[in-house]
Design a protein with these regions (language model features):
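Active-site-adjacent elements of ketosynthase-type condensing enzymes
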Residues: 128-139
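Short beta-strand-to-turn element immediately C-terminal to the catalytic PLP-Schiff-base lysine
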Residues: 99-103, 141, 167-170, 185-187, ...
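Conserved protein kinase catalytic domain
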Residues: 73-76, 96-99, 166, 185, ...
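A short core secondary-structure module
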Residues: 152-190
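Flexible, small-/acidic-enriched active-site or ligand-binding loops
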Residues: 135-137, 155-156, 186-219
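A short, Trp-centered hydrophobic/proline-enriched beta-strand micro-motif
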Residues: 116-127, 167
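Alpha-helical interface subdomain recognition
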Residues: 1-83, 102-105, 112, 116-117, ...
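N-terminal glycine-rich flavin-associated loop
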Residues: 84-105
Length: 338
C-alpha cells in the first residue's frame, strides 16, 4: 500500500508548516496567544482561513477543499509541532463534521466556519458520562412549539468564545438509550458560561442551559451517528497532534544530547543513551504508522474507521507517556550521567 502524500497534500503540508513556523516561533509566542482574552489570536485564525487551512478540514461537497483523514492528520500533526492553540479542533473538525453529516446541512454556517467568520463549539461531555456516546442526561423539550434545553455540559473546548454551540440533549428515553437523542444549535447568549484554562493552555467551559432556546438539527439514529463520527474525527485529530508533539520532543532531545557535554564528550555518545533514543524512535514510528492507517480508513465503513482510530488513540496514550518521561529524564541531571 502506498502511503506517500499526493502533490496537493505535500503543498498543503509545506504551506501549513511555513505558516505555523512563522507565527509560532517559540513558546513565548504561544503564551502570548494563550493569555489573550479569547485564548487564541484572532488575526492568526483569520489568516488561517485566508490560506485555506480551515477549508482543508471540510469536504468539497460543503465548500471546503479536503476533509479526508489525511487532511486532518497533516494539519494536526503540524499543530502538535507548533503547539498552536487556535480552535481548529472545536470549530474546524468537531462542529464542521456534524454540520456536514446531518441530512439537511446548513451550507451557510459551514461556509462561515471555513471563512473564519464563525466559531461553533460542540458540547457533548457531561459529568456522569464516561465513554458511551449515547449517555446523555441533558434534556430537550418543546415549549410553545420551540425547543428548550436544560442541563449542564462539561469540558466544552472554546465554549466561551463560540458564537454558537452544537449541543446533544435527550428528547425522550433513559439516559443511556441509543434512541431519543437530539442535536441542537444554540446561540451563545442563551447559555451560562463558566470558562477556565486547561493544563495545556486551551480554553474550556462548563455550559449551563436553563430553558435555552435551541434549533433541532438532527435526532435519533442520525444524531447518534453524527456524534460518533465527530468524536472519531476528533480522536484522529488529537492522535495526529500528539504525534507532532512526540516528534518535536524527540528532535529537541536529540539536539540536546548532541550539544550537552559530560566527562569530556557529548552525552549522546554514550551507548545506553543511544539505546534509549532508538527505542523511543521506534515507538514513535509505530504511532506514525497507526495514525497513517487511521487516516487512510477515515472514509471507510464505521466499524473499520472507529477500530483503526481507537487503535491509534490507544497507542498514542501509551507512547505519549513514554516519550514525555524519557525526554524529560534525558534533559535531566547536569551533574552526572548514570
Amino acid at each position: 500500500m502506498d502511503f506517500s502524500l499526493s502533490e496537493e497534500r505535500k503543498m498543503l503540508q509545506e504551506t501549513v508548516a511555513r505558516f505555523f513556523e512563522s507565527n509560532y516561533q517559540n513558546i513565548n509566542k504561544r503564551n502570548e496567544n494563550v493569555n489573550l482574552p479569547e485564548g487564541f489570536c484572532k488575526n492568526f485564525w483569520k489568516e488561517s482561513a485566508e490560506l485555506g487551512i480551515i477549508s482543508a478540514l471540510v469536504s468539497p461537497k460543503f465548500g471546503g477543499l479536503g476533509g479526508d483523514g489525511d487532511d486532518i492528520s497533516i494539519i494536526f500533526e503540524l499543530i502538535g509541532k507548533s503547539l498552536c492553540v487556535e480552535p481548529f479542533l472545536a470549530s474546524g473538525v468537531l462542529s464542521s463534521t456534524i454540520l456536514s453529516s446531518v441530512s439537511n446541512p446548513n451550507l451557510d454556517l459551514i461556509n462561515q466556519i471555513v471563512e473564519g467568520k464563525l466559531l461553533i463549539a460542540f458540547a457533548h461531555t457531561e459529568m456522569n458520562n464516561r465513554y458511551e456516546d449515547s449517555f446523555i442526561e441533558n434534556s430537550a423539550s418543546l415549549k410553545d412549539n420551540k425547543w428548550c434545553l436544560n442541563g449542564t455540559k462539561s469540558f466544552v473546548i472554546n465554549g466561551d468564545t463560540a458564537n454558537k454551540v452544537i449541543v446533544s440533549a435527550r428528547i425522550d428515553g433513559d439516559v443511556n438509550d441509543k434512541a431519543g437523542i437530539g442535536l441542537f444549535l444554540v446561540d451563545n447568549d442563551q447559555i451560562k458560561n463558566r470558562s477556565y484554562n486547561t493544563v495545556d493552555g486551551y480554553r474550556a467551559s462548563e455550559l449551563i442551559f436553563d430553558t435555552a432556546k435551541a434549533e433541532l438539527i438532527a435526532r435519533d439514529n442520525e444524531a447518534l451517528s453524527c456524534i460518533i463520527k465527530a468524536n472519531s474525527a476528533g480522536a484522529l485529530a488529537l492522535s495526529a497532534e500528539a504525534l507532532g508533539i512526540m516528534e518535536t520532543c524527540f528532535n529537541l532531545t536529540l539536539d540536546y544530547l548532541k550539544t550537552r557535554n559530560q566527562f569530556g564528550k557529548s552525552i549522546g555518545s554514550f551507548q545506553s543513551i543511544q539505546h534509549r533514543m532508538v527505542d523511543m524512535m521506534l515507538e514513535i514510528e509505530q504511532v506514525k504508522s497507526a495514525v497513517m492507517l487511521a487516516s487512510s480508513t477515515y472514509r471507510s465503513d464505521e466499524k473499520t474507521r472507529d477500530r483503526n482510530i481507537s487503535a491509534a488513540k490507544n497507542l498514542v496514550g501509551r507512547v505519549g507517556k513514554l516519550v514525555a518521561e524519557e525526554t524529560i529524564q534525558l534533559h535531566g541531571d547536569r551533574k552526572s550521567v548514570v
